[in-house]
Amino acid sequence: MFSLSNSQYTCQDYISDHIWKTSSH
C-alpha cells in the first residue's frame, strides 16, 4: 500500500488510473 499524502499521487492520477483500469477490461 501507499500513502496518498506521502507521494506525488494526486486525486487526478488516482481517477485516471482507475478509469484506465476499468476501461482496460
Swiss-Prot record:
The keyword Translocase does not apply. Pfam families: Leader_CPA1. One of its GO terms (molecular function) is translation regulator activity. GO terms for biological process: regulation of translation. GO terms for cellular component: cytosol. Arginine attenuator peptide (AAP) that has a regulatory role in the production of arginine-specific carbamoyl phosphate synthetase. Encoded by an upstream open reading frame (uORF) within the 5'-leader region of arginine-specific carbamoyl phosphate synthetase small chain (CPA1) mRNA, it attenuates the translation of the downstream CPA1 ORF. In the presence of high concentrations of arginine, ribosomes translating the uORF encoding AAP stall at the termination codon, resulting in reduced translation from the downstream CPA1 initiation codon. This is Arginine attenuator peptide. It comes from Saccharomyces cerevisiae (strain ATCC 204508 / S288c) (Baker's yeast). The lineage of its organism: Eukaryota, Fungi, Dikarya, Ascomycota, Saccharomycotina.
